[in-house]
Regions:
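Terminal accessory/targeting
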Residues: 1-61, 65-86, 90-104, 108-114, ...
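Glycan-processing catalytic domains of CAZymes
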Residues: 118-120
Length: 165
């Protein structure tokens, strides 16, 4: 038996029934969300600036811990349905350092779809593991993004397992 196929089938086994595809799709979810009347899709920064607290709001946040390429696909789907999201890029993730140029290109693509980019900061882990000063590290990261034409709209703490020990 093909182990990959077995794992896929095991992953999507619901109440004893095996489905060869997940019981949902992100496209289907987005399609359902846009059918909600008077729902206003905002990025996190747009939400913080919004004054009318009586409006229905949808805030989508993605922490890109592992798979930048799937995040880009999700951004395209959201854009198709006129949904906005905030994508937090993890600067300590393997994709960030090993594929920096591609990471920046994908961030620009996501940003061009009217989503925003934030920093999924892991500054304390960088301090303990690599002896990098958090303030200086943050300043360097912000300069890197700015030089690549990417606006960083905010930050979200990563909560690395290394720090949680």
């Amino acid at each position: 038996m093909n182990i990959g196929r077995f794992l896929l089938e095991k992953k999507y086994q619901l109440r004893g029934e095996t489905n060869r595809t997940p019981p949902y799709s992100y496209t289907k979810l987005c399609k359902e969300l846009v059918n909600i009347k008077e729902l206003n899709s905002l990025t996190l920064s747009q939400h913080s600036e919004e004054k009318n607290i009586n409006k229905k709001r949808l805030l989508i946040r993605h922490d890109i811990d592992h798979d930048l390429w799937t995040a880009e696909k999700m951004a395209v789907i959201e854009s198709k349905y006129n949904l906005r999201a905030t994508y937090f890029v993890l600067h300590t993730a393997p994709y960030f350092k090993k594929k920096f140029k591609e990471t920046m290109e994908i961030c620009r693509n996501i940003q061009s779809l009217e989503h925003e980019i934030g920093l999924h900061n892991d500054l304390i882990t960088d301090f303990f593991m690599n002896n990098l000063d958090p303030g200086g590290n943050l300043a360097e990261l912000l300069i890197l993004f700015k030089e690549e034409g990417i606006t960083i709209s905010g930050t979200a703490s990563h909560g690395s397992p290394i720090i949680q020990k």
